[in-house]
């Protein structure tokens, strides 16, 4: 039994996450954590709401509400939505907890005392009307690259370029629209140059990093790491603990990545930190979208090395490409995409989970379309998987006494089928181990496809009339393949898999159970269809329903009122 810390990127809670956010981090992490638990491993799966930083502060100011109240309300909503998506966190916390705040301040003080932090002055935008500095999203203007009129001070949403506020054309305060002035301020910097060689070794010698994470990180290292400011002049955030840093907060990206550690401390205490985060035997795995790679592969390891308190470096960062919606990026401002609260108003979570993992953007951007989703649900989930389950179990239930038949005397075709199903199950296992979740699910589905071909070829309904021994042999092995199917589906569609285990009469599901020959005579549970189809007309009605829901949301002022629960 191995030890694992699994972490999914902490979502900003200025709004509800969308489907791209979900598959890029939280859902993928949940699938992997569920798989590891099914294998019997010791798993701690943590994440939480990123409650600080400029997105929340800007939105709160514009709405005239307190950022702490805003963030707390949205945290509760997002936490509840993740429960409804069956995300199996051991702890879903937030970055404004007492544990996290104290941990971050103590952690950075240690880095400061170790000599890896220095100060320097720089010019930053300041709004004289609102009397605040304008970091990151507090300032907007025209992008110098693509001309987008509402580019932010840290990045252009339209073309994706990283920006500095001084690059913006006609910059203005995001709150009041005033032209900013430039003022000198002092900030505290992490000296990444002193850590560069050790980070390079970590990246180059890490066999577990996926190609996109390794390539992006090596590209940054080739350009040379520069000192990064770890403080901001925000009012909302964790107060910087350094001498002379009164009125400063820790930059949100630098404190949020420490949440993976503070969450384990909150859940397991100091002993838990030693057991999971300070043990060389622990495998630490993060799940993020590709835009979060630098902070997990470069920044967090740098912080751990600079702290010097014996924390293990992450084993890998499983990073996806982007999920597009009908050919374009998800966009809140353009209402383009589907958000996780909306999705659950349209279909049950297992349908969404299956579709998203089946289409997971592992190696390249993937385009979610309703036509493709409908095909996955109807042809793959229902026809291939659900139909095979129903064919096997209804035949055993209705014509073989409702119990697992004896193994009979197998023909070569029967032995070949078990060998094929087992090979596919082992293939799924290898892909799950390698965090190739889409390929794992495809291998699981192939078990059902092989099963349908096997039933068609052997026709056990005919064998029952003339050769009971052969019929027993066929259905015994078909039942066995359903145990493999149930185990393979458990991480992806937990509710449906639980129902399948129940129908199979298996009381203690595990991955290893799938390898065990069935117990002849064991009774089945009540058999009923696992999945259903959706017609094109139903999808049209779902999209109509989506527009109605959005009209209701648009009429509500506050984001926590707009969320659909």
From Swiss-Prot:
Its cofactor is Zn(2+). It is found in: Cytoplasm. ATP binds at residue 332. Zn(2+) binds at residues 143, 146, 156, 159. Pfam families: Anticodon_3, tRNA-synt_1g. It is an enzyme of class 6 (ligase). InterPro entries: Anticodon_Met, Met-tRNA_ligase_1, Met-tRNA_synth, Methionyl/Leucyl_tRNA_Synth, MetRS_core, MetRS_Zn, Rossmann-like_a/b/a_fold, tRNAsynth_Ia_anticodon-bd. One of its GO terms (cellular component) is aminoacyl-tRNA synthetase multienzyme complex. A motif ('KMSKS' region) lies at residues 329-333. A motif ('HIGH' region) lies at residues 11-21. Keywords: Aminoacyl-tRNA synthetase, ATP-binding, Cytoplasm, Ligase, Metal-binding, Nucleotide-binding, Protein biosynthesis, Zinc. One of its GO terms (molecular function) is metal ion binding. Binds 1 zinc ion per subunit. Its EC number is 6.1.1.10. It comes from the Archaea. It catalyses: tRNA(Met) + L-methionine + ATP = L-methionyl-tRNA(Met) + AMP + diphosphate. GO terms for biological process: methionyl-tRNA aminoacylation. PANTHER family: METHIONINE--TRNA LIGASE (PTHR45765), METHIONINE--TRNA LIGASE, CYTOPLASMIC (PTHR45765:SF1). Belongs to the class-I aminoacyl-tRNA synthetase family. MetG type 1 subfamily. Is required not only for elongation of protein synthesis but also for the initiation of all mRNA translation through initiator tRNA(fMet) aminoacylation. This is Methionine--tRNA ligase. It comes from Pyrobaculum neutrophilum (strain DSM 2338 / JCM 9278 / NBRC 100436 / V24Sta) (Thermoproteus neutrophilus).
């Amino acid at each position: 039994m191995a030890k694992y810390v699994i972490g999914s990127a902490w979502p900003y809670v200025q709004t509800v996450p969308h489907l791209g956010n979900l598959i890029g981090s939280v859902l993928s992490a949940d699938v992997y954590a569920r798989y590891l638990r099914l294998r019997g491993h010791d798993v701690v799966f943590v994440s939480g709401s990123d409650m600080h930083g400029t997105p929340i502060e800007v939105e709160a100011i514009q709405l005239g509400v307190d950022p702490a109240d805003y963030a707390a309300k949205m945290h509760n909503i997002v936490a509840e939505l993740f429960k409804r998506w069956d995300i199996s966190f051991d702890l879903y916390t937030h970055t404004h907890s007492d544990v996290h705040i104290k941990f971050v301040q103590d952690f950075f003080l240690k880095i400061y005392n170790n000599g890896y932090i220095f100060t320097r002055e720089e010019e930053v935008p300041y709004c004289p009307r609102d009397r605040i500095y304008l970091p990151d999203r507090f300032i907007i203007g025209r992008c110098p690259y693509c001309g987008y009129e509402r580019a932010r001070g840290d990045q252009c949403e339209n073309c994706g370029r990283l920006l500095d506020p001084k690059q913006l054309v006609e910059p203005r305060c995001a709150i009041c629209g005033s032209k900013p002035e430039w003022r000198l301020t002092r900030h505290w910097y992490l000296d990444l140059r002193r850590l560069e060689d050790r980070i390079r070794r970590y990246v180059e010698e890490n066999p577990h990093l996926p190609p996109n994470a390794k390539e992006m990180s090596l590209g940054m290292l080739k350009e040379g790491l520069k000192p990064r400011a770890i403080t901001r002049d925000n009012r909302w955030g964790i107060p910087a603990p350094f001498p002379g840093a009164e009125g400063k907060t820790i930059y949100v990206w630098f404190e949020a990545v420490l949440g993976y550690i503070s969450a384990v401390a909150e859940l397991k205490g100091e002993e838990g930190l030693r057991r999971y985060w300070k043990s060389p035997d622990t495998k630490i795995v993060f799940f993020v979208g590709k835009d979060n790679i630098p902070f997990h592969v470069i920044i967090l390891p740098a912080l751990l090395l600079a702290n010097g308190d014996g924390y293990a470096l992450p084993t890998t960062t499983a990073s996806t490409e982007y999920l597009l919606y009908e050919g374009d990026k998800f966009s809140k401002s353009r209402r383009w995409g589907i958000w996780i609260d909306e999705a659950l108003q349209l279909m049950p979570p297992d349908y969404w989970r299956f579709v998203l993992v089946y289409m997971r953007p592992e190696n390249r951007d993937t385009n979610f379309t309703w036509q493709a989703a409908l095909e996955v649900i109807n042809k793959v989930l229902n026809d291939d998987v659900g139909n095979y389950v129903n064919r096997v179990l209804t035949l055993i239930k209705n014509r073989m006494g409702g119990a697992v038949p004896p193994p009979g005397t197998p023909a070569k075709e029967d032995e070949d089928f078990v060998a094929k199903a087992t090979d596919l199950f082992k293939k799924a296992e290898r892909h799950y181990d390698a965090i190739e979740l889409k390929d794992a699910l495809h291998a699981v589905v192939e078990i059902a496809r092989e099963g349908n071909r096997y039933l068609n070829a052997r026709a056990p309904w005919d064998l029952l009339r003339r050769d009971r021994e052969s019929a027993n042999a066929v259905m015994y092995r078909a039942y066995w393949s359903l145990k493999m199917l149930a185990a393979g589906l458990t991480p992806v569609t937990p509710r449906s898999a639980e129902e399948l285990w129940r129908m199979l009469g298996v009381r203690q599901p595990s991955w290893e159970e799938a390898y065990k020959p069935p117990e002849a005579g064991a009774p089945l549970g009540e058999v009923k269809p696992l999945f259903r189809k959706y017609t094109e007309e139903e999808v049209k009605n779902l999209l109509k329903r989506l527009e109605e829901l959005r009209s209701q949301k648009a009429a509500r002022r506050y984001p926590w009122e707009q969320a659909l629960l």
